[in-house]
Regions:
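Beta-strand-rich structural segments
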Residues: 2-34, 39-41, 134-137, 193-194
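Short, aromatic- and glycine-rich surface loops/edge beta-strands on solvent-exposed regions
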Residues: 76-88
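Glycine-centered loop-to-beta-strand initiation motif
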Residues: 59-68, 164-166
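Extracellular acidic loop/turn motifs
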Residues: 28-33, 47-48, 145-146
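Short, hydrophobic beta-strand segments
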Residues: 66-77
Length: 194
């Protein structure tokens, strides 16, 4: 996987799921400046800093703004520090994140998937729009898993058919299939409505 703006759609980082952040770069005078040879490192729960799996992508014509997608392994903690350094140009930028641990409503293995959907197995109760507003996180198989959960994706469920086909927003970076394992997570924005 690579940097993808699709992982910036959630209102907060979910523990052990990919998450994209914007990175501003300012020079010594406080003016926006594009970075030269970015070098981004992270620390989980006050551990030693290590190189991020991805590197900052500078937005064309951005005047000092880039973005980076942290892996699920890089968000697998209570507090995450990200330091975006450069070979020359702007000063280092520091960002802190507090990934949320959300209650698991149900877990399973998908029976199918597509760019913007995941189909629940028949063993999971499904009612029209019941899961709307909940968060789904992939945990293994295609579109999930990897070392430390590096490839896990999290999305908001925007629709649920009576047949158990969940619509998600935004579309998946890597489309799930019948090998994809998942957790459906509750949060204060989800009420199990019908």
């Amino acid at each position: 996987m690579a940097n993808s703006t699709s992982h910036a759609a959630l209102p907060f980082p979910v523990k052990n799921a990919r998450f994209t952040i914007l990175v501003p770069y300012l020079d010594a005078d406080g003016d926006p400046t594009d970075p030269t040879t970015p070098d981004t490192e992270f620390s989980v729960d006050a551990g030693a800093f290590a190189d991020c799996a991805e590197e900052v992508t500078t937005i064309s014509g951005s005047n000092g703004v880039g973005y980076i997608t942290l892996t699920g392994a890089e968000t697998n903690g209570s507090m995450v520090a990200v330091v975006a350094k450069v070979a020359s140009g702007p000063k280092a930028t520091i960002t802190t994140l507090y990934p949320r641990v959300l209650p698991i409503i149900v877990s399973g293995t998908a029976s199918a998937g597509a760019a913007g959907t995941l189909t629940l197995p028949s063993t999971i109760f499904s009612r029209l729009n019941y899961f709307n507003g909940a968060i789904i996180r992939t945990t293994g198989g295609t579109g999930g898993g990897g070392t430390g959960g590096a490839n896990n994706q999290a999305r908001i469920i925007t629709g649920c058919t009576a047949a158990g086909v969940l619509s998600v927003s935004p579309n998946w970076e890597t489309t799930p299939d019948n090998t994809t394992t998942f957790d459906i997570l509750g949060w204060e924005g989800w009420h199990g409505q019908t």
